[in-house]
UniProtKB/Swiss-Prot annotation:
Gene source species: Ureaplasma parvum serovar 3 (strain ATCC 700970)
Pfam family, one: DUF1410
Protein family per UniProt: To U.parvum UU376.
Protein name (database record): Uncharacterized protein UU171
Matching InterPro entries: DUF1410
Source domain of life: Bacteria
Amino acid sequence: MIANKITINKIQNGTATIEVTFSKFKLADANKKDFVLEVKDSANDDASAISATELVFDANKKILTGKLNGLASNINYKISKFTLNNNEIKFDFKQEDQQELLNQYIQQAELNTIIDKANKKINIKLQNFSILNSFQDNQPVLTFDIEINKKDGITQVVHKSLTKNQLLNPNGLEIDLKDKMKNNIDYWTLAYVVWFLAI
């Protein structure tokens, strides 16, 4: 058995629905399907595992769905155990599948921006964003453009990237834009952020 896609919906009241799609699925006994799926805090090996409940397998679509209860939105979870009839299930993620999974995390996130016009700074904080544990601490995870329009219609673009550590910073990421704005005091009529995946 090989799983090649995972979908996790937004955590609400500590509960999320998980969906696993299989690219390869074959059983000697079609009537025996004992799935076990557990997740745990990726940063704490001693944390208790959370077992998925209400697991239902659709043989035609090769999709397993279930519920995860007792989740915290500020914790990055990893799959600690995934078996079928006591046999470990392997994962085979393609690049586009990894990107789609990360997109799901981004869609769940809340992006907060605080603009300090006087000091020409912007603070960006991403909340409710569980980062995949496969990323390294200093690996760029997201890149984005800050577009600042001048009153004369010319747009100044600042390109930045966020690492895993920066995304986990509870104070957000502060970006100093003095160098980009030093020759024109008419900046800050409009500012917004456009996000891209870095993988």
